[in-house]
């Protein structure tokens, strides 16, 4: 799985660095035809998923020290950030494995742990919401009489 979904340098490097090549990454590839982008050389395990047309992010998978999320310990934890409706964010606060967005706008992004503490259905819901919130908006038609101006 890691060798086919990740494109981080060599195939061996991709395989070795790819604990983030989760079923979520396969879901994103299969449902949205989107492969991970690795934009930062200094954090090769940070995977950005974005719309091809507008380049807006809809998911960011990375690992962070547990203490950055308010948890005990400094071990690394795989997480994913999603763009989210503020009402949904407030309803999910306090749920196990859900955190205020790490390194993003906390009013419109949310972080979910990828350690099994968040049900797969919740991850899928958050991914789909994020994808919809960040997709290109349809262009409005020009008002009558203004097409030729």
Predicted feature locations:
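Charge-dense, helix-prone N-terminal extensions
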Residues: 1-149
């Amino acid at each position: 799985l890691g060798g086919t979904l990740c494109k981080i340098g060599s195939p061996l490097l991709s395989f070795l660095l790819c604990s983030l090549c989760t079923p979520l990454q396969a879901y994103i590839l299969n449902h949205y035809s989107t492969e991970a982008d690795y934009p930062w050389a200094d954090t090769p395990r940070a995977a950005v998923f974005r719309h091809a047309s507008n380049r807006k992010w809809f998911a960011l998978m990375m690992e962070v020290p547990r203490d950055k999320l308010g948890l005990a310990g400094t071990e690394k934890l795989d997480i994913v950030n999603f763009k989210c409706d503020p009402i949904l964010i407030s309803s999910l606060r306090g749920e196990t494995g859900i955190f205020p967005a790490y390194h993003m706008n906390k009013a419109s992004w949310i972080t979910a742990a990828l350690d099994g503490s968040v049900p797969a259905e919740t991850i899928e819901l958050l991914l789909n919401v994020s994808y919809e919130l960040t997709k290109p908006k349809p262009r409005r038609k020009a008002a009558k009489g203004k097409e030729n101006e």
